[in-house]
Each structure stands twice: as structure tokens, then as C-alpha cells.
Amino acid sequence: MDIRAAEISAILKEQIKNFGKEAEVSEVGQVLSVGDGIARVYGLDNVQAGEMVEFPGGIRGMALNLESDNVGVVIFGADRDIKEGDVVKRTGAIVDVPVGPELLGRVVDALGNPIDGKGPIKAKERRRVDVKAPGIIPRKSVHEPMSTGLKAIDALIPVGRGQRELVIGDRQTGKTAIILDTFLNQKPIHDNGPDKDKLYCVYVAVGQKRSTVAQFVKVLEERGALEYSIVVAATASDPAPMQYLAPFAGCAMGEYFRDNGQHALIGYDDLSKQAVAYRQMSLLLRRPPGREAYPGDVFYLHSRLLERAAKLNDENGAGSLTALPVIETQGNDVSAFIPTNVISITDGQIFLETNLFYQGIRPAVNVGLSVSRVGSSAQIKAMKQVAGSIKGELAQYREMAAFAQFGSDLDAATQRLLNRGARLTELLKQPQFSPLKTEEQVAVIYAGVNGYLDKLAVNQVGKFEEGLLASLRTEHKDVLEGICNEKALTDDLKAKLKAAIDAFAKSFA
């Protein structure tokens, strides 16, 4: 067998030419111990705080505790398949999620992976989950209304675009229902409104039952609201790190719209469960516990999340991100640690009460304890004109109602006040899934504060309202359109509205 030198050298040259010049360098560590969703890893000397690391089998984790001799890693997934001595790789990337309009209409987990079975998400952009909130200079004070469609809120506790309004109450008081109705109320704007007014919705479910989240998504889908919404779900069966991360992931998705000159609304449901998940992680990482065994930085956990909701000024695109965080209280105790923290961070709270809920006053908003620190700058002029007096009348009614229990012989003025108050309270009730446009709310409240309900029996108020709205929508469209376009009750509009209500009141009697 003759060996041709030229041939061998040609083959060798060819092989050398194709030889991979780049060796893959990856910094690795070893698992020292693992359990309860936490791994202690030796090595990984240059790992960054919050960096993603990879375990065998594609399981991911996040480096949270950087200690002198090891790294504490929280695991996003089951820790059953991870054992002592396993090799852990750095990925070099801080935790990020896909963002953009491609996510609208989808249900994703805390890392942005789709969990709705509708195929992969082809997002063009990714963002870090934990970024710094906008500073003072890029912001602008809140001045545009974010309409919820609920009379009790839009009239008395108005929420503006870029505001953070806490929804707080015991379990089963209708907190999620307020967020759901607010999402549904954006449908008319998405169908017919200008692009600049459209409000994209993000719902973050933390530690909830899967059936509850499925029900929420089903309602959005049936009512055509899923097409402008994103649902981020970290349910009760998900690991604590996912429940901790979900609000930050949802916030990053909402910030995409805020930073592109659009408007977004995010509901965190609920932050009490996020705090519990964070407490679990912190205690397992052996961080020192503080009040109620929460770690010392649980205030910072919520403040850095909620500070990212902002209204940006015109130089920065004039976008906004409005936050509706939810907190669940135990036995109406708003003085517990997490509720007081979040109340002090947010720009007001909507306080829901169990006994109001069981009295049939739904939404069960306690108007006396609820406030909006942005106030009437988040209302259109027409709403300010009619809602100004309803606040005062309801406050007087609550005060009088407390005294009226003792005395039987009340003077006529007090009796009148109590009658009016009872009817206004009835007027502010609203069934679920039936949000009203702002101009319709203005018309209804105008009828209430101008004495049209005083002669009616309390149980007739709802019927009167339904009939009045039906009459306005069919025969007096021009009045509603006028309020919508003018955004104020001019003398001319007031006269038209008064005539329309007078005509209806005659036929109703």
C-alpha cells in the first residue's frame, strides 16, 4: 500500500482548516446541597446578583445570595432531579422576559413562556425583569382619567393614568372583580377610540388557584377583552421563585407600552402572596427575619415594583403605566405589616368591606375609608361637576345614619338627607361585567344629585337607572355624545340632559 504524502498533507490541511478555533468557555460550579427549592453552589466566583444559572436537564435558577464561600440559588422548577455534585453553568444573562405586542392575547408564566397551548411567542424584544424606575425628571403629574367603568370609583375615588391605586380588602370581597371590570371597560376604546387613548392590560396572578385564573381568562376571551390583554400566571402550585418573579415580569411587559408612548394598566393579584413567597425564599436562604418573619427588604420589594408605574412627560413619549396592586387583609386588619407598607407606597386605596358585600352593596367600596391622592385631576370636567356634591352628601349621610339609629324623631332636613343618601348608595351599586362609559355615569349621577330619585322607593332606583340609560342611548344619543366630546356639562348640555331626564321621569312614574 503506497502512501501518497501530498494526499495526506492535503487531508490534514483540510482537517486543520475546519478545526474549531473557538473553545467554549463556561464558568461552572458544583452543587453542595439542595432542598426546598434552594441550591448551595460552590464555584461560580464571578456570578452576578440575579443572574440565571443552568442545572443539568435544562432546569434554571437565579443567583440571589452571593456569599464568600458559596452562592445561594433559587430554582425555577422542581429540585427533585438536582443532586449534590451536579455541575451548574453560568448563563451570563440577568433574568429577562419577552415583551411587545406579540404577547397580547396570551397567557404566560413568570419567565414569559407560553402556557396557553397556542404555540410559541415570536417576540422581537426582551427586557430585564428588574430595572430601575424612571427618575423625577422624565415624569409628569397624573392628569388623564383611567376609567374603570364603575360609578363608585370613577366618581368618588378617581384613578388617573400613571397612578398606583391599591385595592385592599378581605378574601371574597370582589377585589379581582374590580380589576376584571376595569379591563372590560377598555373594550369600547379599543374598538372605536383613537390609538393614543388605548389602554393595554396586564394581569399578574400570584399564588392563585389555576381554576380562578382559567375563569378570569375565559371571561376576558368571551367578552373580547383578551386581544388587548396579557396574563402572567404563577399559580399556587408553582415554585416560590416564580411567584416572586411574576409581578416583575408583568411589569416589564407593561413598561414596553409605557416607554413607547402608549398606555398600559397592570393588576397585581395579589402582592400579599408575592410577599409570602419572598419570605419563604429569604428564610430558606437564611436571611435574618424581621417583623412577622418577613425579611428586612420586603418594603423595598414592593416599592421598587410599584415605583415603575409612572406617567412620562412629552419629551419621553407621554406614555403611562397604571398599577392596581391588590392586598388581601385578614379580618379587615389594615394595620398589619404588608398592608401598611403598600398603603404608604401607593397613591390611594380602594377599601372593600365584607359586611358591605353581604349587605348587597357591590362593588363593596367603603367610600369613607377609600381615597385617591391624585383626586379630581384624574376626572373630566363633567364628572367633577356632578361628583363634587355626591361626595359631600354621602359623607353627611354616613355621619347622620350613625346618629339616626338612636333617635326616632328626626327633623325634616335630616330625614331628607337620609333619604337622599340611601338612594345615592343604591345608585352606586353596579352588577359585575357591566361597566358604564363616563358620559353615562355623568348622566346617572346628575339625576341622583338633582333629586330625581328622592320620590322613588329605594328598590326602584336600579330600574330607574336602567330605563334612563336605555332612553338616553336610543332617543338622546346627542346628549351622551355631547358630554363625551365636550368633556364638560355646558349650560346647553345641562338643559338637554335635564329635559331628557324630565321626560323619562314622567313616563317612569
Curated annotation (Swiss-Prot):
Membrane topology value: Peripheral membrane protein
Gene3D superfamilies reported for this sequence: 2.40.30.20, ATP synthase alpha/beta chain, C-terminal domain, P-loop containing nucleotide triphosphate hydrolases
Binding site for ATP: 169-176
Annotated TM spans: none
Major localization listed first in the record, in broad terms: membrane
Annotated EC: 7.1.2.2
Site description Required for activity, residues in chain: 370
Reaction(s) catalysed (UniProt annotation): ATP + H2O + 4 H(+)(in) = ADP + phosphate + 5 H(+)(out)
One cellular component (GO) term of this entry: plasma membrane
Protein location: Cell inner membrane
One GO molecular-function entry: ADP binding
UniProt keyword terms in alphabetical order: ATP synthesis, ATP-binding, Cell inner membrane, Cell membrane, CF(1), Hydrogen ion transport, Ion transport, Membrane, Nucleotide-binding, Translocase, Transport
Pfam families: ATP-synt_ab, ATP-synt_ab_C, ATP-synt_ab_N
Keyword Nucleotide-binding attributed: yes
Cell cycle is among the record's keywords: no
Entry-linked PROSITE patterns: ATPASE_ALPHA_BETA (PS00152)
InterPro entries reported in the protein's UniProt record: ATP_synth_asu-like_sf, ATP_synth_asu_C, ATP_synth_asu_C_sf, ATP_synth_F1_a_nt-bd_dom, ATP_synth_F1_asu, ATPase_a/bsu_AS, ATPase_F1/V1/A1_a/bsu_N, ATPase_F1/V1/A1_a/bsu_N_sf
CDD domains registered for this protein in UniProt: ATP-synt_F1_alpha_C (cd18113), ATP-synt_F1_alpha_N (cd18116), F1-ATPase_alpha_CD (cd01132)
Role summary: Produces ATP from ADP in the presence of a proton gradient across the membrane. The alpha chain is a regulatory subunit.
Family: Belongs to the ATPase alpha/beta chains family.
Quaternary structure, from the entry: F-type ATPases have 2 components, CF(1) - the catalytic core - and CF(0) - the membrane proton channel. CF(1) has five subunits: alpha(3), beta(3), gamma(1), delta(1), epsilon(1). CF(0) has three main subunits: a(1), b(2) and c(9-12). The alpha and beta chains form an alternating ring which encloses part of the gamma chain. CF(1) is attached to CF(0) by a central stalk formed by the gamma and epsilon chains, while a peripheral stalk is formed by the delta and b chains.
Name of the molecule in the record: ATP synthase subunit alpha
Species whose genome carries this gene: Brucella melitensis biotype 2 (strain ATCC 23457)
